[in-house]
């Protein structure tokens, strides 16, 4: 069984491999979001980055994603506090605020199937952003409703 490094290792001390393994691969960070100009309220949409594979919830061009999507955000220990748009289910966010990993997390289950089965991921729930005319028509609540 894998050592539960996330319990004993501070985020800023993790190796790049440990840091990357924290990502559950849910795909929610790849959803387009809208921030209301007047209220600063955050809204998730089901319009996903055109590089997201809707079946695997992975980026089709992950190693080179910034070439294709320059505005893609790299989540790091240095910027995690600023990324308030990450969903509460995100392992990076959870660990940053002192919570543990949820029971469905791939580091605890050994695969992504429990996450998909629990409805945590975006699997089968997104549309390609290139096919969307108005993001406002794509606002959804489910990315925020599935926290353990």
From Swiss-Prot:
InterPro entries: Puta_zinc/iron-chelating_dom, UCP006173
Coiled-coil segments on the chain, per record: none
Cystines in this chain: none
Alphabetized PANTHER family for the sequence: UPF0260 PROTEIN YCGN
Family: Belongs to the UPF0260 family.
HAMAP family the UniProt entry points to: UPF0260
Protein name: UPF0260 protein Sfri_1740
Organism: Shewanella frigidimarina (strain NCIMB 400)
């Amino acid at each position: 069984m894998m050592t539960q490094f996330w319990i004993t290792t501070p985020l800023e001390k993790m190796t790049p491999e440990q840091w990357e393994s924290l990502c559950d691969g849910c795909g929610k960070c790849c959803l387009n979001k809208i921030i209301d100009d007047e209220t600063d309220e955050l809204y998730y949409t089901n319009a996903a980055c055109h590089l997201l594979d809707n079946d695997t919830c992975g980026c089709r061009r992950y190693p080179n994603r910034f070439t294709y999507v320059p505005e893609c955000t790299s989540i790091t220990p240095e910027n995690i506090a600023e990324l308030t748009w990450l969903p509460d289910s995100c392992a990076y966010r959870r660990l940053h605020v002192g919570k543990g990993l949820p029971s469905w997390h791939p580091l605890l289950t050994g695969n992504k199937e429990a996450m998909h089965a629990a409805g945590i991921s975006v699997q089968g729930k997104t549309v390609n952003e290139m096919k969307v005319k108005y993001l406002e028509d794509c606002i959804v609540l489910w990315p925020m409703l599935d926290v353990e």
